[in-house]
Amino acid sequence: MMEERDIRAFVFGTTRYFEVAAQQAATVGSPFLVTQGAPEVHDYTGVIEVSGRRRGVVYFSAPRGMLTVLLMKMNESDVSHENLCDLVGEVANTISGNVRRDFGKDFTISPPSVVTGHAAPITLPSGCRPVVIPIHWRSHAARLVVCLQ
């Protein structure tokens, strides 16, 4: 079961990513627990599997428009599908890596995998309830989903 301090670590990791990479802060909405099914995803989702002391998944899901603007904010003019996939994986990996500092070396993260499409299934660990952290940046909305045992 995740505790409030665990969620705070992910919130900080998320806001820190946008402050550094986009040089523009993101705001985070109130995290909420999903009690039935899996949370919805956007156009692109970067998935990180977690093992070690904690097990589960962390994923960052964002619409194409948000990722396109983020690439341009990073002075990248190539907004191809491949670059959008690379970016969403990088965001998920960086946020998880930032959190690893708080959770310690026993918080092992996989390289990111990327899923595209709204109906893409993300496998969640059985018996684990995901926490959704809404992210707002400029006029865009994304979400970080954390499901750890």
Question: What residue spans do the PLM features occupy?
Answer:
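N-terminal auxiliary interaction/assembly segments of multi-subunit proteins
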Residues: M1-Q149
